[in-house]
């Protein structure tokens, strides 16, 4: 009888890994190796071999993993929640859930740096910006930030840069702000020497000490204040005013821009995004036109393509960290694009009337609730409110909380004498009557119908919104499910994501986001929990986070993990803050020098600056490695002030630097700590561990190495791992044992997407994770070897091998043919590919990272495209193709151009079908090459009129 494998362990590994066994061996043979172990042994430096401490179980099957995580999710208790405080239940419209959130065309896309293949999500983001601009009454809005609290911190530093009160280091923050926002403000302010003064704005007599102010609108306790006079006073004192505003409330309230606010920030969570135990959610940031060049975050703008037709792109990128480094407006790289797009489509689907109707329903239910509570003898502290009430409940407060929880209801905990209630989109008449029952104490409940008939708005007449909202046709057209479904399909068809093609972006790790990993994200057991719910209700999340932290410790060799940072940039920041606090705890406050190699990603110096450190750049040698002697000299020179080294490993040049242990030793010998940037961890899991070869702290990108999708530019998760001496300095939170050092609004950051990483690790197991790293290295070296005859590979290790990515040097081709790296990137679109990373870390190069998920067939398809492009460049070099009018200079080619008058000296077929395989399935870019200069010189960051597309 044939032996049958009755087990299901490790089944998923072959689903995640691209190359089949025969292909894998052929690729190894092309490199001169007979096994993955031999290749790994040759790539990994001797000094760090054997440092991996990965001791995980076998991988679970997809069915078993889903069953296990379903059991974990079931331990979370779903109470009816009225906690509010910036987080509200809402309904995610089913067509948005099915056609956007659960659609890989949307969630597997990358940040839209290549505009020609990103027009769909750029349009969705432009809708988001228009939504924010309309509701806040300010003309410029960005394409999202990480959460409301970090947006408030960005507003604070924004005010500091722009305020004319240059001698001031004090920032006023209203005591009516959400407490989690105040905590993050304090964290961000301290390293920058900013003093956050928290007070009651109604009692503020002297505003002259402040460079800026943050006001909450409506207030966290529910009050709606008129800030006009106060704003004028701040402006008279040369201070700027930021307003944290509730988007749904702004459909009914006078917008901040109309009462003089300089900045509006807040969260778009209640526009269709689940609570998710705190995230991910899209924050917003809008401001006056005069301040646009100092805005943080991405900004979508309208430009034109080479045919003069409207086209969208990311505008004013010179503000950002990848260009300005330590002088950037922010260190933020990943934002919250997927969540911003959900909020955008929520507004598109409901339109201005629908949003206003939801807001009016919420407000009137709150008014009915308040009237009923008053009739029951409960003191309601607010007379003007939108959706939130503070109740003076005195000695009964604790008993009322207990009574509510016994009925599976959460009320907001304020103090021993008061509690809070926030009504939301999901609240019903039955809910209001149940709430009355909590407070009735045997009294007859009020008559809902009678109170509803008499209910009136409590918003003061002076604050009732008069200006229209969302008048653009996009918000007034797609209100049936059929229309919205087709609109989302039309937008998705304009873009390239992993559902169509590999995305070989170096330093980005665009690997498979498996369907089984994604499924738990939409479960109510994970999505419907409030981040400030009592701990006993989140036992499932506690188990999930405990297990995930242990898994990540095993993968990295660190002793402790914090899952709070909600982006890689925030992980970097939290890591440097831990180092800073460690030095301070030892009485070494003077240590503020951060050494950073010249090859580092721009987030590194931008983050060091935010953490109050001075950046000293160290040199790299001709092979792309850190110049150890220059590093040693600078470490010794600054030994009394040395705080840290930030180094990426494997390096941003795509190689395992052989001197990494020596590098770490130099820093430690001179009193510093070593921050190993984990952006390239996909080459190390199961092979070597940064916590075991000299790292004191690293951040990980769960949206790279551990399979959380990029979402078109977010969400991301950037947890940090630390050695035990830094554990006391990990981020805290007001709802955790350690209160200090919060870097984002929620205790566990983007908690609701952590199941993705849990699923990936449990299904891959220890052997699968190691194999993934080995295949990532194999695929990169296979591409490097296939293309090295056509393009110089800029950096390799001493054995001629790369790590998990390779850099092709196109600079000689610019000299010989006039063809630029940009031309090659755009020509790849005609072949159906997203371009590799352009001009980073070296100008004029392409950095390619294929990941382990791509098959040999797909790798060959990409290599064939690159080789054919080299042939076209050669034709330009020898004069066969015109140096100005050729397929590369004119790429990408659109269908409209193909059927129009053809004036080029090369054929239509050469333009759009340069290889025969494209005939089977062709991606058509919706626009020609986008004019970046025009877009920045003629900045438009809201939906243009329909006529402009004519």
UniProtKB/Swiss-Prot annotation:
Entries under InterPro entries matching the protein: GcvP, GDC-P_C, GDC-P_N, GDC_P, PyrdxlP-dep_Trfase, PyrdxlP-dep_Trfase_major, PyrdxlP-dep_Trfase_small
Taxonomic lineage from the root: Bacteria, Pseudomonadati, Pseudomonadota, Gammaproteobacteria, Pseudomonadales
Catalytic activity: N(6)-[(R)-lipoyl]-L-lysyl-[glycine-cleavage complex H protein] + glycine + H(+) = N(6)-[(R)-S(8)-aminomethyldihydrolipoyl]-L-lysyl-[glycine-cleavage complex H protein] + CO2
Protein name according to UniProt: Glycine dehydrogenase (decarboxylating) 1
Cofactor(s) this protein cannot do without: pyridoxal 5'-phosphate
UniProt organism field: Pseudomonas fluorescens (strain Pf0-1)
Entry EC no(s): 1.4.4.2
GO BP, sorted A to Z: glycine decarboxylation via glycine cleavage system
GO molecular function: glycine binding; glycine dehydrogenase (decarboxylating) activity; pyridoxal phosphate binding
């Amino acid at each position: 009888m044939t032996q049958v494998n009755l087990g299901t362990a490790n089944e998923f590994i072959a689903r995640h890994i691209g190359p089949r066994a025969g292909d894998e061996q052929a690729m190894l043979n092309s490199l001169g190796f007979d096994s993955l172990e031999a290749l790994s042994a040759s790539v990994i430096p001797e000094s760090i071999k054997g440092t991996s401490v990965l001791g995980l179980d076998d991988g679970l099957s997809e069915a078993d993993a889903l069953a296990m995580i379903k059991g974990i999710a079931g331990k979370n208790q779903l109470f009816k929640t009225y906690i509010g405080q910036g987080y509200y239940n809402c309904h995610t419209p089913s067509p948005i859930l099915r056609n956007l959130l659960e659609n890989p065309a949307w969630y597997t896309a990358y940040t839209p740096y290549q505009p020609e293949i990103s027009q769909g999500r750029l349009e969705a983001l432009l809708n988001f910006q228009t939504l924010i601009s309309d509701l806040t009454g300010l003309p410029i809005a960005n394409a999202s930030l990480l959460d409301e609290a970090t947006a408030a911190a960005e507003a604070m530093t924004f005010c500091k840069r722009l305020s004319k009160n240059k001698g001031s280091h004090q920032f006023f923050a209203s005591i009516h702000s959400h407490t989690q926002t105040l905590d993050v403000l304090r964290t961000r302010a301290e390293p920058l020497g900013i003093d956050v003064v928290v007070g009651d704005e109604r009692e503020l007599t002297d505003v002259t000490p402040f460079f800026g102010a943050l006001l909450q609108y409506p207030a966290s306790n529910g009050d709606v204040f008129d800030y006009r006079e106060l704003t004028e006073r701040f402006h008279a004192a040369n201070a700027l005013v930021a307003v944290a505003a509730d988007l749904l409330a702004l459909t009914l309230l006078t917008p901040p821009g109309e009462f003089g606010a300089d900045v509006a920030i807040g969260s778009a969570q209640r526009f269709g995004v689940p609570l998710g135990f705190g995230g991910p959610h899209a924050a917003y940031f809008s401001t006056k036109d005069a301040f646009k060049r100092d805005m943080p975050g991405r900004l979508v703008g309208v430009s034109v393509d080479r045919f003069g037709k409207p086209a969208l792109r990311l505008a004013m990128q010179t503000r950002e960290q990848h260009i300005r480094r330590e002088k950037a407006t922010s260190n933020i790289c990943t934002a919250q694009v997927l969540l911003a797009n959900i909020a955008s489509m929520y507004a598109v689907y409901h339109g201005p009337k629908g949003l206003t109707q939801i807001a009016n329903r919420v407000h009137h239910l709150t008014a009915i609730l308040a009237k009923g509570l008053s009739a029951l003898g409960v003191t309601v502290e607010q007379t003007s409110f939108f959706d939130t009430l503070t109740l003076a409940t005195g000695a009964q407060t604790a008993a009322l909380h207990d009574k509510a929880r016994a009925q599976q209801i959460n009320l907001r905990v304020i103090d021993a004498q008061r509690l809070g209630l926030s009504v939301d989109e999901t609240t019903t008449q039955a809910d209001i009557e149940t709430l009355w029952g909590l407070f009735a104490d045997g009294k007859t409940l009020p008559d809902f119908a009678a109170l509803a008939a008499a209910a009136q708005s409590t918003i003061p007449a002076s604050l009732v919104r008069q200006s229209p909202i969302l008048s653009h046709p996009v918000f007034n057209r797609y209100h049936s499910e059929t229309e919205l479904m087709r609109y989302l399909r039309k937008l998705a068809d304009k873009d390239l994501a992993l559902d169509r093609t590999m995305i070989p972006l170096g330093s980005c790790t665009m690997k498979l986001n498996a369907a089984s990993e994604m499924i738990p994200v939409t479960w109510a057991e994970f999505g419907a929990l409030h981040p400030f719910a009592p701990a006993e209700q989140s036992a499932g999340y506690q188990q999930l986070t405990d297990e995930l932290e242990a898994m990540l410790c095993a993968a990295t060799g660190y002793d402790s993990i914090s899952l709070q940072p909600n982006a890689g940039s925030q992980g970097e920041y939290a890591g440097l803050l831990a180092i800073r606090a460690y030095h301070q705890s030892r009485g070494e406050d003077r240590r503020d020098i951060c050494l950073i190699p010249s090859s580092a990603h721009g987030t590194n110096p931008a983050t060091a600056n935010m953490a109050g450190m001075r950046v000293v750049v160290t040199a790299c040698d001709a092979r792309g490695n850190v110049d150890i002697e220059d590093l040693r000299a600078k470490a010794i020179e600054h030994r009394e002030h040395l705080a840290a080294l930030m180094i990426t490993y494997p390096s941003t040049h795509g190689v395992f630097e052989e001197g990494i242990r020596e590098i770490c030793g130099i820093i430690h010998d001179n009193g510093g700590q070593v921050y190993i940037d984990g952006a390239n961890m996909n080459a190390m899991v199961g092979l070597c561990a940064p916590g075991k070869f000299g790292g004191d702290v690293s951040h990980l990108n769960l949206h790279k190495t551990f399979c959380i999708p990029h979402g078109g530019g977010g969400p991301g998760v950037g947890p940090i791992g630390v050695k035990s001496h830094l554990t006391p300095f990990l981020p805290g939170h007001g709802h955790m044992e350690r209160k200090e050092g919060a870097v984002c609004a929620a205790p566990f950051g983007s908690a609701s997407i952590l199941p993705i990483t849990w699923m990936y690790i449990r299904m891959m197991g220890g052997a699968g994770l190691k194999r993934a790293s080995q295949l990532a290295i194999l695929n990169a070296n296979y591409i490097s070897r296939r293309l090295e005859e056509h393009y110089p590979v800029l950096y390799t290790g001493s054995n001629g091998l790369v790590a998990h990515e390779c850099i092709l040097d196109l600079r000689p081709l610019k000299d010989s043919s006039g063809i630029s790296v940009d031309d090659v990137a755009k020509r790849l679109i005609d072949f159906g590919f997203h371009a590799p990373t352009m001009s980073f870390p070296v100008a004029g190069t392409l950095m390619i990272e294929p990941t382990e998920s791509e098959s040999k067939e797909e790798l060959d398809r990409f290599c064939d495209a690159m080789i054919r492009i080299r042939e076209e460049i050669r034709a330009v070099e020898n004069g066969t193709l015109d140096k100005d009018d050729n397929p590369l200079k004119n790429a990408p080619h659109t269908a409209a151009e193909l059927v129009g008058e053809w004036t080029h000296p090369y054929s239509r077929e050469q333009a759009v079908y340069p290889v025969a395989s494209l005939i089977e399935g062709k991606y058509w870019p919706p626009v020609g090459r986008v004019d970046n200069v025009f877009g920045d010189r003629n900045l438009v960051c809201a939906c243009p009129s329909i006529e402009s597309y004519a």
